[in-house]
Regions:
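Serine-esterase "nucleophile elbow" of acetyl-processing enzymes
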Residues: 5-65
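Alpha-helical cap/lid subdomain in secreted, periplasmic
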Residues: 34-40, 53-122
């Protein structure tokens, strides 16, 4: 989070620009207007959202700055199964790339999903 804030602060020519936030409940519950008061912000966070659902939301981020935090709802059995882990990771990364390309942002800031407790998820 600190890295994101520092990165945005370094973009002085973009002050007062627009930031579009997309993600799951972590984004939906984030008071982005308070966190980024000098920016025009849009919060498209949806509780329970999965990465592959973003493409169905018909969002237009062309030439806008996008902050993404999504993916924790995608984690589960395949990631923790030794036989399917590598395939899951490869597919997940590919889906992330396709999603970003589909949004066509000017610039994208991807916030890493939070660690999950393996025992609880199973």
């Amino acid at each position: 989070m600190l890295l994101l804030i520092l990165s945005l602060g370094a973009c002085s020519e973009e002050k007062e620009g627009e930031l579009c936030f997309v993600g799951d409940s972590l984004v939906a519950g984030w008071d982005v207007k308070d966190a980024f008061p000098t920016w025009i912000v849009r919060n498209d966070g949806v509780s329970g959202a999965k990465l592959e659902e973003i493409a169905t939301w018909n969002l237009n981020y062309q030439d806008k700055n996008v902050v993404m935090l999504i993916g924790t709802n995608n984690l589960g059995g395949k990631l923790f199964n030794d036989a399917t882990r590598q395939e899951f990771i490869t597919d997940f990364v590919d889906e992330y790339k396709r999603t970003i390309e589909g949004l066509a942002p000017r610039r994208v800031f991807v916030i890493s999903i939070l660690p999950r407790n393996r025992e609880i998820d199973n």
